[in-house]
């Protein structure tokens, strides 16, 4: 089986006989149900391949679809002029970058369909290209825009540049409305959907597929597709890891499944991670290896967001579906970017509860944020966390606390915010990382407790005070009965009282009992 890792050309995949998961029945329905569409999905989720497939279909390349579902559905195989704008190729952090990219694309189309010199602005030239493409071919035009939002995302934090980009894109996309009679089909894809002063505000007939139940599996891999198409590599993976097929499926589900794009929808697997897993026959964090956008940190910084709330967020469809550039709320971006997903839906109130989709995202996002909030630098993070965990597994609470104190003392405070929030966020990330290797709990039934860590041989109960006293923290462990649930447990139990100085932004004292 040839895996199309990194390949986004439908034609190349089909001609070179790479694996293609057949979504063409949905594509056929899509081209008949409506005219103007928008789809947001996380990066590396197959959006570019979808656009390429549509380009091949509307170009009438019937031979590429032999044996696929659409082969028996489509009878005409007409060819239409296709204008494909790919905004994923450039860097848009400098003024003029977007205008140059649009100019190059329109100039290329004009070389095919001609240009009138009186058309001066990009929007006028785009309108002219659409009209002339129709008149030259006698066929309505298909417009495909891939990663429409990349310029806007790269301009987060630069309000002036983002406003310029938004205005430019709005004027260009406005051509779709003015030239409607010449257009057969249009699809715009991206990671996010920007609202308020939207680039789509003139396109009031744009159908959003992002939370459409019928098309929830248009990108990504379903459980049925996984078990039928990848049956053989799943067996190979199970053999390598000495697992049963059922156990291998469970591990794949834990690591790569869990994306839900509609209420009560089916789980969708990240295709990029699955393909890499089967290609290498190794469980890994492949989605994060391709890079995590720094604009996420910018948003978290601007909002002074409390990271422990990440898995407690409740939101509505209106909020999730639309990003307001005037707002610092990071949740819509985190959801649309694939770092959070729908976990449950309250039908009565129309509210979605969010959380991490799977272990790959949860662990990868935690590792990504750790250097921004603590003294753990990126290259050293795996080693440093290993030392933390080895201390815990070996029953060395003093060494563990020494490392903890050093970690806070070394922090370079890339994230600006009040000291209490800084401590809570840093401590949350550290506890989260340790939780991937040990059992970590942050609450009890009798009230709030900062941290309980369990290994095979030891139990640690840690109470933190902010500008308080390590003695009082230790005393509170007994008063609140935090150790009571472990009264019959044979493992050695350590109680640790810790004080964090908000002024110094460091751990200034701890006591162990």
Residue ranges: model-predicted function:
Residues 142, 458-460, 494:
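Structural motif
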Residues 162-168, 466-483:
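Mg2+/Mn2+-dependent nuclease catalytic core
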Residues 172-179, 332-340, 428-432, 476-496:
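Metal-dependent nuclease catalytic cores in nucleic-acid-processing enzymes
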Residues 448, 459, 506:
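Short, mixed charged/polar active-site loops
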Residues 485, 489-513:
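Domain-level recognition of nuclease-like catalytic cores that cleave nucleotide substrates
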């Amino acid at each position: 089986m040839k895996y199309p890792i990194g390949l986004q050309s439908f034609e190349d995949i089909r001609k070179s006989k790479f694996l293609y998961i057949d979504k063409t029945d949905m594509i056929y329905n899509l081209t008949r149900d409506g005219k103007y569409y928008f789809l947001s999905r996380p990066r590396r989720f197959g959006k570019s391949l979808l656009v390429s497939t549509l380009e091949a279909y509307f170009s009438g390349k019937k031979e590429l679809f032999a044996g696929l579902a659409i082969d028996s559905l489509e009878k005409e195989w007409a060819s239409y002029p296709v204008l494909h704008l790919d905004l994923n190729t450039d860097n848009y952090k400098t003024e003029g970058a977007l205008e140059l990219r649009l100019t190059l694309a329109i100039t290329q189309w004009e070389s095919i369909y001609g240009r009138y010199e009186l058309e001066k602005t990009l929007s006028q030239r785009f309108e002219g290209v659409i009209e002339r493409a129709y008149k030259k071919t006698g066929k309505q035009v298909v417009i495909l825009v891939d990663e429409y939002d990349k310029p806007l995302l790269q301009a987060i934090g630069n309000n002036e540049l983002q406003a310029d980009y938004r205005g430019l894109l709005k004027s260009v996309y406005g051509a779709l409305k003015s030239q409607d009679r010449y257009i057969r089909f249009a699809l715009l894809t991206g990671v996010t959907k920007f609202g308020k002063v939207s680039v789509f505000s003139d396109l009031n007939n744009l159908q959003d597929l992002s939370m459409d139940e019928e098309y929830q599996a248009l990108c990504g891999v379903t459980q049925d597709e996984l078990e039928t198409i990848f049956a053989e590599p799943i067996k190979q993976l199970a053999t390598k890891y000495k697992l049963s097929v059922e156990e291998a499926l469970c591990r794949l589900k834990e690591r790569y499944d869990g994306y839900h794009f509609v209420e009560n929808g089916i789980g969708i697997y990240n295709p990029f991670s699955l393909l890499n897993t089967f290609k290498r026959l190794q469980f890994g964090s492949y989605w994060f290896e391709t890079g995590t956008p720094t604009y996420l940190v910018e948003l978290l910084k601007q909002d002074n967001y409390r990271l422990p709330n990440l898995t407690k967020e409740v939101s509505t469809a209106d909020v999730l579906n639309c990003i307001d550039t005037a707002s610092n709320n990071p949740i819509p971006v985190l959801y649309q970017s694939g770092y959070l997903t729908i976990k449950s839906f309250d039908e009565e109130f129309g509210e979605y509860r969010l959380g991490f989709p799977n272990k790959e995202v949860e662990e990868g996002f935690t590792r990504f944020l750790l250097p921004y909030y603590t003294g753990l630098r990126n290259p050293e993070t795996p080693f440093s966390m290993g030392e933390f965990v080895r201390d815990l597994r070996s029953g060395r609470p003093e060494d563990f606390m020494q490392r903890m104190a050093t970690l806070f003392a070394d922090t370079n405070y890339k994230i600006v915010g009040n000291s209490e929030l800084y401590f809570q966020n840093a401590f949350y990330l550290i506890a989260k990382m340790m939780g991937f290797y040990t059992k970590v709990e942050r609450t009890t039934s009798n009230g709030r407790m900062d941290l309980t860590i369990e290994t095979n041989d030891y139990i640690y109960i840690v109470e933190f005070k902010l500008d308080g006293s390590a003695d009082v923290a230790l005393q509170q462990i007994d008063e609140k009965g935090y150790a009571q649930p472990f009264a019959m447990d044979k493992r050695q139990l350590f109680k640790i009282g810790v004080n964090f100085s908000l002024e110094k932004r460091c751990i200034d004292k701890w006591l162990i009992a």
